[in-house]
C-alpha cells in the first residue's frame, strides 16, 4: 500500500470512530514520509486536541489501527500518548513507541481516574487495555467485541482529568447475531463500496473485494455502529 494512502486511512479511522457521529474533532495530520514509519519515530501520524466533556473510543481506534498495520505487514504495534503540555491536552497517535517518550513528561498509568497535570502523560500500547479491563470483566469478555475501554475528559481551567471506563453492550445476543451475519457473508465474493471519506481528506478510495482478509475491518466498523445503536453501558 502507498504510504501516503496509509496515513490518510489511519487518520480517517481517527476522524470517523474516535468520537460519536456528528462530533467534530480537531485533528492535525502529519506530512507522510519514510520518517514516520521508522521504529521509534518521533512524529505522530496525527494529533487530536481533546475537548472537555467528550467520550473517546480509544481502544476501538487503537485496535483498528493495529489491525490495519498488521494487514500491511508493518512490524511494530501502534502507540497512543495522551499528554498535557500546559497549553493543551492532546492525543498523539504513533506507528510505534517513540524513542523520545520523556519529552511528554512524567508517565502515569491508565486508571479509572487520571489527573493529568502539566507535563504528565498516559502512554497506551498493546497490553494496556487488557490490563485495565482484567479486574473489571470476566476473562471471556476481554476482547473488543465484548468490552471496550473509553475515556471521558474533564478539561477545565483548574482541572485536567481523564476518566477511563469499560463499556459493554446491553444485548450481547444482538451483537453476536449481527457479527454472525457478517461472518457468513465473508464466504461470498462480491464488491463492496466503502463509506465515502470526509471531504477534508479528499481521498478517493476504489471499491474493494470482501474476503476473509478484510472481514475484520468490516466487523470492527459494525461494532462501532452497534455500540451506538445498543447504547453501551458503563461498568
UniProtKB/Swiss-Prot annotation:
Residues 233-235 are nuclear. It is a single-pass membrane protein. Phosphorylated. The chain crosses the membrane at residues 215-232. Signal peptide: none annotated. Forms a heterohexameric complex with NEC1. This is Nuclear egress protein 2.
Amino acid at each position: 500500500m502507498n504510504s501516503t494512502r496509509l496515513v490518510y486511512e489511519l487518520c480517517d479511522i481517527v476522524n470517523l470512530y474516535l468520537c460519536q457521529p456528528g462530533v467534530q474533532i480537531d485533528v492535525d495530520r502529519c506530512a507522510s514520509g519514510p520518517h514516520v514509519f521508522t521504529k521509534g519515530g518521533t512524529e505522530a501520524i496525527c494529533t487530536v486536541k481533546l475537548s472537555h466533556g467528550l467520550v473517546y473510543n480509544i481502544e476501538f481506534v487503537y485496535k483498528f489501527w493495529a489491525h490495519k498495520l498488521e494487514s500491511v505487514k508493518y512490524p511494530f504495534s501502534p502507540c497512543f500518548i495522551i499528554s498535557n503540555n500546559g497549553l493543551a491536552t492532546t492525543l498523539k497517535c504513533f506507528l510505534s513507541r517513540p524513542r523520545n517518550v520523556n519529552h511528554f513528561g512524567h508517565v502515569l498509568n491508565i486508571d479509572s481516574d487520571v489527573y493529568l497535570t502539566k507535563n504528565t502523560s498516559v502512554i497506551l500500547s498493546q497490553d494496556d487495555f487488557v490490563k485495565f479491563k482484567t479486574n473489571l470483566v470476566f476473562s471471556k469478555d476481554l476482547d473488543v467485541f465484548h468490552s471496550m475501554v473509553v475515556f471521558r475528559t474533564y478539561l477545565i481551567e483548574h482541572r485536567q482529568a481523564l476518566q477511563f471506563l469499560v463499556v459493554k453492550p446491553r444485548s450481547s445476543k444482538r451483537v453476536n447475531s449481527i457479527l454472525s451475519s457478517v461472518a457468513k457473508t465473508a464466504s461470498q465474493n462480491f464488491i463492496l463500496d466503502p463509506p465515502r471519506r470526509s471531504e477534508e481528506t479528499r481521498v478517493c478510495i476504489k471499491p474493494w473485494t470482501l474476503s476473509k482478509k478484510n472481514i475484520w475491518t468490516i466487523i470492527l466498523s459494525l461494532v462501532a455502529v452497534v455500540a451506538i445503536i445498543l447504547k453501551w453501558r458503563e461498568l
